């Protein structure tokens, strides 16, 4: 795809690379209590254990799948029509929304009537936007606080469990050693939670719809699901659930197009992006967002102040509450699931950034700081926060309360400006919760490792356990081009301490707009960080995939090693650089150690020797050492021998 209007309107096609199933994988669905609750997962087929290792059956592994219908061969993908409205029946059945006659935002109507944008517009939307009926609240938090378990909550419970119980049962039924195998493959190290992060961290062995409801009701988790984005597959963000990751996409004034951004979205979700933020600041922001939302099975977030700034030609001092309010309604009617709103950037905090090394690095934060200084007034976002809540609950848009004063260098970490804003975000959370509006809190930024836990502990305390959503944090500032790694270190740590969602950083951070390859690199890095955090927390079932891959590695099932990994393509590519032949896929060594120094091959030889001698492995090792000792003495007890 590209930015050519005729091409977009007439010939837009999905990226072929995003629709092919991953190797040895297929889409499966688990049905809930009603037929239209069909929860997708990715089933990874495994080969049987070779007879030389015992000849066991290895049943499929089920993993969390964010790719939506794109990797389902039975689905018809037409990005000009968009995805099926998965949640529409559930929304209709609640009877608390009304269909509007058309768009109600001034800007939305203006764009719809502009002939210059006609060929750019998404052509497949034939339904009108919805809004809560007068006096109604349509948020998932409101339903949860009424004791209601919505279809979205049941869907999430099934999704979070990843068919773990069925997998262990299939192991038990795999043969005479099934029970032992199930115990081995289900084994998991105990996690560790400590300090403030331990408070309220209590994921049960099995996630139930009731548990989902209770966590949402308490504000400890959110379900971002705008009623105008029925295409989204329900997911949850909370520290008692799997750690999630977000991928940022979006055009700029100098690069990218609508088509490239849609491709980035489908690419990001293929590799595991749980949500996507459209941070477009260039041309056609409204149209770009429509294409993305209509084709996205994951929640979409935005920073509305970016588009509001475009409406006043980039002059922050010309922004008004009325322009911003119209932008919120415009985006809510399109279906944006969560808004980053920098309402914590208050006039009193701006001078606190004067002595920083890197000042204010948040785009949204700098916009609001400039407005506050230009007018010497309190931020209109802060002053009108109650009115913003009224808009949010009419569409079920979640808050992502922005950290506009986050540190942009480790020099500035945990300073007075950052922590002052965090306290304000805690106060705003309480206001939003009075309206039953869902909230998560955005966090830094650049923070050295020894200061990361303080961020988490203060957030849990001041923000009353609302989910934390952090950008990294980056743990050092010396590696431009490698900031996916500097931040991945901090992301794994803060995820362990209790952060619910990690915002990815790509290798292009601080350097340029990421392309598709950068998006994938960032996603894989952050999937790794999130998974490491799940393991450290002892999240139920987190170790199942590790155990399966380790078993495949020990049994030299190379294809299973590749396919069980986060990036099968790269694993296979690296292996084949030195051992490309098919015969190498069954070899009992790789190019790292070769056939004579493979530690796993040596272990297998010990086991075979023990079986032949009818002794234990320890006895076999002892006996082998005794034989070698005799040989050493007979050879003259010389450590080194001349050849």
From Swiss-Prot:
Enzyme class, top EC level, equals: lyase
GO MF: 4 iron, 4 sulfur cluster binding; carbon-carbon lyase activity; zinc ion binding
Annotated cofactor note = Binds 1 [4Fe-4S] cluster per subunit. The cluster is coordinated with 3 cysteines and an exchangeable S-adenosyl-L-methionine.
Which residues take part in binding Zn(2+)?
446, 510
Q: Which reaction is catalysed here?
A: 5-amino-1-(5-phospho-beta-D-ribosyl)imidazole + S-adenosyl-L-methionine = 4-amino-2-methyl-5-(phosphooxymethyl)pyrimidine + CO + 5'-deoxyadenosine + formate + L-methionine + 3 H(+)
Q: Which cofactor does it need?
A: [4Fe-4S] cluster
Q: Which residues bind [4Fe-4S] cluster?
A: 590, 593, 598
Alphabetized, the UniProt keywords read: 4Fe-4S, Iron, Iron-sulfur, Lyase, Metal-binding, S-adenosyl-L-methionine, Thiamine biosynthesis, Zinc
Instruction: Please state the pathway this protein functions in, per its UniProt record.
Output: Cofactor biosynthesis; thiamine diphosphate biosynthesis
For this protein, the record's InterPro entries field holds: ThiC (IPR037509), ThiC-associated_dom (IPR025747), ThiC/Bza_core_dom (IPR038521), ThiC/BzaA/B (IPR002817)
Q: Where does substrate bind?
A: 248, 277, 306, 342, 362-364, 403-406, 442, 469
Q: Which GO terms describe its cellular component?
A: cytosol
Q: What biological processes does GO assign it?
A: thiamine biosynthetic process; thiamine diphosphate biosynthetic process
What's one Pfam family the UniProt record gives for this protein? ThiC-associated
In short, the EC number is 4.1.99.17
Q: Briefly, what is this protein's role?
A: Catalyzes the synthesis of the hydroxymethylpyrimidine phosphate (HMP-P) moiety of thiamine from aminoimidazole ribotide (AIR) in a radical S-adenosyl-L-methionine (SAM)-dependent reaction.
Q: How does it assemble?
A: Homodimer.
Q: Which PANTHER family match?
A: PHOSPHOMETHYLPYRIMIDINE SYNTHASE, CHLOROPLASTIC, THIAMINE BIOSYNTHESIS PROTEIN THIC
Entry's family note: Belongs to the ThiC family.
> What's the protein name?
Phosphomethylpyrimidine synthase
Q: Which organism is it from?
A: Burkholderia mallei (strain ATCC 23344)
Q: What is the lineage of its organism?
A: Bacteria, Pseudomonadati, Pseudomonadota, Betaproteobacteria, Burkholderiales
């Amino acid at each position: 795809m590209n930015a050519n209007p005729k091409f977009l309107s007439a010939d837009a096609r999905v990226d072929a690379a995003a629709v092919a199933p991953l190797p040895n994988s297929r889409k499966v669905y688990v049905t809930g209590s009603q037929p239209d609750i069909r929860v997708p997962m990715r089933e990874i087929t495994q080969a049987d254990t070779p007879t030389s290792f015992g000849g066991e059956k290895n049943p499929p592994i089920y993993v969390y799948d964010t790719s939506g219908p794109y990797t389902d061969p039975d689905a018809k993908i037409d990005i000009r029509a968009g995805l099926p409205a998965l949640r529409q029946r559930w929304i209709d059945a609640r009877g608390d929304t009304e269909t509007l006659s058309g768009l109600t935002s001034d800007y939305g109507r203006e764009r719809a009537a502009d002939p210059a944008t006609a060929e750019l517009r998404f052509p497949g939307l034939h339904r009108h936007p919805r809004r809560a009926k007068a006096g109604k609240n349509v948020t998932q938090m409101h339903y949860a606080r009424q004791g209601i378990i919505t279809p979205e909550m049941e869907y999430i419970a099934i999704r979070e469990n990843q068919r773990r119980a069925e997998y262990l049962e299939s192991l038990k039924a795999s043969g005479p050693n099934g029970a032992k195998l199930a115990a081995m493959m289900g084994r998991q190290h105990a996690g560790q939670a400590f300090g403030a992060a331990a408070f309220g961290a209590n994921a049960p062995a099995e996630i139930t719809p009731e548990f989902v409801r209770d966590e949402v009701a308490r504000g400890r988790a959110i379900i971002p699901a705008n009623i105008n984005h029925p295409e989204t597959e329900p997911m949850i963000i909370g520290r008692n659930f799997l750690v999630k990751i977000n991928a940022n996409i979006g055009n700029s004034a100098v690069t990218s197009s609508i088509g490239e951004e849609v491709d980035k979205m489908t690419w990001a979700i293929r590799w595991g992006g749980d949500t996507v933020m459209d941070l477009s600041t260039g041309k056609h922001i409204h149209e770009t967002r429509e294409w993305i939302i209509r084709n996205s099975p994951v929640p979409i977030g935005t920073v509305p102040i970016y588009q509001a700034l475009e409406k006043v030609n980039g002059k922050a001092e010309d922004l008004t509450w009325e322009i911003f309010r119209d932008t919120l309604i415009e985006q809510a009617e399109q279906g944006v699931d969560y808004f980053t709103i920098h309402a914590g950037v208050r006039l009193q905090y701006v001078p606190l950034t004067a002595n920083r090394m890197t000042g204010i690095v948040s785009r949204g934060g700098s916009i609001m700081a400039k407005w506050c200084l230009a007018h010497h007034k309190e931020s209109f976002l802060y002053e009108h926060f109650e009115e913003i809540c009224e808009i949010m609950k009419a569409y079920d848009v979640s808050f992502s309360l922005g950290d506009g004063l986050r540190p942009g260098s480790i020099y500035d970490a945990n300073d007075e400006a950052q922590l002052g804003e965090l306290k304000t975000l805690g106060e705003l959370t309480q206001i939003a919760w009075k309206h039953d509006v869902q909230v998560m809190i955005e966090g830094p930024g650049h923070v050295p490792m020894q200061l990361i836990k303080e961020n988490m502990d203060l957030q849990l305390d001041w923000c009353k356990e609302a989910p934390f959503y952090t950008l990294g944090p980056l743990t050092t500032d010396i590696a431009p081009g490698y900031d996916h790694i500097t931040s991945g270190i901090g992301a794994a740590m803060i995820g362990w301490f209790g952060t619910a969602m990690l915002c990815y950083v790509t290798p292009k951070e601080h350097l340029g707009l990421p392309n598709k390859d950068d998006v994938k690199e960032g996603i894989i890095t952050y999937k790794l960080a999130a998974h490491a955090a799940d393991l450290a927390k002892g999240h139920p079932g987190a170790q199942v995939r590790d155990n399966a891959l380790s078993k495949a590695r020990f049994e030299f099932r190379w294809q299973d090693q590749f396919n069980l990994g986060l990036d099968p393509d790269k694993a296979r590519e690296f292996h084949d650089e030195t051992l490309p032949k098919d015969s190498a896929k069954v070899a009992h060594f790789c190019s790292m150690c070769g056939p004579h120094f493979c530690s796993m091959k040596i272990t297998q030889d010990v086991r075979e020797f023990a079986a032949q001698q009818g002794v234990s492995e320890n006895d076999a090792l002892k006996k082998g050492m005794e034989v070698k000792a005799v040989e050493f003495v007979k050879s003259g007890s010389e450590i080194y021998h001349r050849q």
